[in-house]
Amino acid sequence: METIAAIATAQSPSAIGIVRLSGEETRRVLAALFTPASGMAVEALPYRRMTYGDIRSADGTLLDRGMAVCFSAAHSYTGEESAELHCHGSPVVLSEVLQAAFAAGAQQARPGEFTQRAFLNGKLDLTEAEAVIDLIDAETAESARNAAAQLSGALRRPIESVYDKLLDVSSRFYAVVDYPDEDIEDLSREETERTLLCCEETLSDLLGTFARGKVLKNGVATAIIGAPNAGKSSLLNALVGFDRAIVTDIAGTTRDTVEEKATVGGVLLRLIDTAGLHETDDLVEQLGVERSKKAVEDADLILALLDGSTGLSASEARAAEMLAPLELAAKSGKPWLLLLTKSDLGGGAGIVPDKDWRTPEAIISLSSVTHEGFDALEAAIRTLYPAPKGDTSLVTNARQADAIRRALDSVRAAKDALQSGMTPDVVLTEVEQAENALGELTGRTAREDMVARIFERFCVGK
């Protein structure tokens, strides 16, 4: 394959920037750019040892002084001869070094091409390749740890274990189909059934992590609802750490949904500040209220706010208005927290409504001004969305979940066929379908267009 080059670090002023090379002509391209200060020839540079020297353009112009390091195919990221040039992190300098590499014969790397070559050369499977981009995009420490575990094979290992077991089953049934006169079926039926049951349990457990994994990767869609002036926008601003939403003493300031991300208790929340839920003749406010209700339908978690400074001691009409959002949350079927806001203003007598509703996961008194109660809010959210234990990896994307689901369905069908006494070829067909689904997951049997789509998500240089 042709030798490729790209800038591997962010193109903004920094102490260090890196240009990567990979391919058969890596040493030749590097020799055209880099002159070791020791006088040693680039071809003689030892692997995995940093060497100081000059970095020059094709016409000999000094571009920078920096370090070069070479990697053998056996010990490189891509599985090919590779090298890195470490220079000062000026975008201008990095661009000139990259252009010099092109002048020496290297080609511009496509997005994700380094990782794609690692996959093609057997350094990574597809689950590990996907973990690379997940690690780059991680927005919380927990999502970064999950991606790191997946990159180290935490998802690959149980999938490979199931795949190997299924291969053993299919080999047994091929023997039965190919040699029908041999007494093989009865000897292996009970063991085969146990094997399929073990595979079913493993795949079911993996698929069961998808709901949590999806939330871990994309964040918890969290609707903040309440009556007008209940403190919704103030809470949003306090959680994100800056004034994202306009806050005034005028009820109905927020007329549309406002979205922002925040990490609360180590959990990524996609916060949706909604318009106050109330009856109104104003057309714009009506649209805002409808969007608020839609946000509740789409949410994973609901934060229902009640003005804790007045509670339900207001007029009957106002009390009904304040209760409406709580009723919506309680009847949504979603996990919800009742937040009694404005605790810094006192009050709060007779706050909690005595209604025959599904109780909230927690009732928390808090202040968006003093941050009183925020520790309790973080603890409640962490209880709802606990961190994965140990080095296990959660399934985090729809491609992985779909492949596991199809494999699980086929394993169950094979087990049912075996228990029903159906012919070996029927069982074999289902087992092979499960193998193919798992092969797509790891990349053994993945289509070229699907593989290309995965690597299109990567940045250039990775």
Region locations from a protein language model:
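Switch I (G2) and immediately adjacent beta-strands of P-loop GTPase domains
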Residues: 51-64, 68-72, 252-280, 301
